[in-house]
UniProtKB/Swiss-Prot annotation:
GO terms for biological process: translation. It comes from Leptospira borgpetersenii serovar Hardjo-bovis (strain JB197). GO terms for cellular component: ribonucleoprotein complex; ribosome. This is Large ribosomal subunit protein bL28. HAMAP family: Ribosomal_bL28. PANTHER family: 39S RIBOSOMAL PROTEIN L28, MITOCHONDRIAL (PTHR13528), LARGE RIBOSOMAL SUBUNIT PROTEIN BL28M (PTHR13528:SF2). It holds the Pfam family Ribosomal_L28. Keywords: Ribonucleoprotein, Ribosomal protein. Residues 1-21 are annotated as: Disordered. Belongs to the bacterial ribosomal protein bL28 family. Residues 11-20 have a biased composition (Polar residues). It comes from the Bacteria. GO terms for molecular function: structural constituent of ribosome. The keyword rRNA-binding does not apply.
Length: 94
């Protein structure tokens, strides 16, 4: 799974560290991601999504569906997952 926010689409970016003597070295900046359970009142169920802490602030302000639409995302993030709640061991046995 890529390190990408499911609400805003933000991911890892790369650039340079620049020292005092202007020597440039490559580095990456990773998104501060968390897993968050959100209750969908109109569907009466919980959804677990992976989002950045910045997106979490937006969710508290606007609500989940408005935040996804404003960022050009798909509401498919909220769709029930095919194997939600099933462990890897149970999938191997099946």
């Amino acid at each position: 799974m890529a390190r990408r926010c499911e609400v805003t689409g933000r991911g890892t970016v790369s650039g340079n560290n620049v020292s005092h003597s202007h020597i440039k070295t490559r580095r990456t900046w990773k998104v501060n991601l968390i897993k968050k359970r959100i209750f969908l009142e109109d569907e009466n169920r919980w959804v677990t999504i992976r989002l950045s802490t910045r997106a979490l602030r937006t969710l508290r302000k606007k609500g989940i569906k408005a935040a996804i639409k404003d960022n050009g995302g798909s509401l498919g993030v909220l769709a029930p997952k095919k194997y939600a709640g099933i462990t890897k061991q149970a999938l191997k046995k099946a």
